[in-house]
């Protein structure tokens, strides 16, 4: 994603309501490349990813035919496969969800798009038009009230910034350092809506962690007290495991069903993982070899 916080943010041509300018990332149809862009949930909270698909006021934009865009649901910016969640300076455990299995399938899809003209699967991302892209407050997102989890609805805001007279969206020389926010000029930033467990509804949901969830995975985390606790915790998301039993859940006041309630026998978990993985494979969003790996890993898990 284009990270310089200046218009244009989206691939198709549009008019910016904040500046009145009309522009696009892609504007030379004869030579524009094929594009597959992915963003994690954290990119919505920290890097204004929603502006790829809507304008400054939240009005939905249409992506060009040569662009595909996918949300890697409920993932943080980067997670190391197999690494145990840890808190560091964050309040909650880090998010262990790794969406690499989807990236592998999309690389194959890009290769086919270029070599034989087979288009990739349709884009999958949250949209305001179907209620899956919303304001960051709790009422809008639907994030559950989980014991010992602070939800501030804090998002990295994006005011229009003045970089000095020699800098435009096309580049130039920054003469105003640090750049100054222009009063009364701000871009609306939206985030993915979540389900009753607190996991993103839209996008590509990893079968063994969201198709059959083991906890809540988010694209945001807060810093602990003593580490600027009012702020988001950098590029780290959150992992909030489900209680193992109904008794544990009831004792803590957790509204999310426990593992015991979700998966009375281990086969229930494996069946849900298998069904979810098969659906993605049919849509060419998972490779068969990764389906086998996911199912093998799920078989080895003790749930509940």
In which residue ranges do the predicted regions lie?
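C-terminal His-loop and adjacent cap/lid subdomain of alpha/beta-hydrolase
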Residues: 1-304
């Amino acid at each position: 994603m284009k990270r310089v916080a200046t218009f244009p943010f989206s691939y198709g041509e549009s008019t910016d309501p904040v500046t009145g300018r009309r522009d696009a990332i892609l504007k030379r149809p004869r030579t524009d490349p094929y594009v597959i862009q992915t963003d994690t949930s954290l990119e919505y909270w920290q890097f204004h990813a929603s502006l790829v698909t809507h304008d400054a006021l939240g009005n939905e934009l249409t992506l060009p035919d040569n662009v595909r865009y996918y949300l890697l649901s409920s993932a943080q910016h980067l997670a190391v496969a197999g690494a145990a969640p840890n808190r560091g300076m964050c309040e909650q455990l880090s998010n262990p969800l790794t969406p690499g299995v989807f990236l592998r399938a999309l690389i194959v899809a890009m290769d086919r798009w270029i070599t034989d003209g087979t288009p990739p699967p349709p884009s999958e991302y949250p949209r305001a038009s179907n209620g899956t892209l919303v304001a960051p407050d709790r009422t809008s997102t639907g994030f559950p009230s989980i014991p010992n989890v602070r939800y501030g609805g804090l998002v990295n805001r994006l005011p229009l910034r003045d970089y000095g007279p020699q800098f435009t969206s096309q580049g130039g020389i920054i003469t105003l350092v640090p750049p100054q926010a222009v009063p009364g000029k701000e871009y609306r930033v939206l985030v993915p809506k979540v389900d009753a467990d607190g996991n993103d509804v839209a996008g590509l949901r990893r079968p063994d962690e969201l198709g059959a969830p083991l906890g809540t995975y988010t694209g945001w985390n807060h810093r602990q007290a003593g580490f600027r606790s009012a702020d988001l915790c950098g590029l780290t998301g959150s992992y909030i495991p489900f209680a193992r039993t109904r008794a544990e859940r009831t004792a803590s006041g957790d509204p999310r069903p426990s593992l015991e309630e979700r998966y009375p026998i281990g086969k229930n978990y494996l069946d849900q993982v298998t069904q979810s993985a098969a659906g993605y494979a049919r849509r060419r969003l998972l490779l068969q070899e990764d389906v086998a790996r996911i199912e093998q890993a799920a078989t080895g898990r003790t749930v509940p």
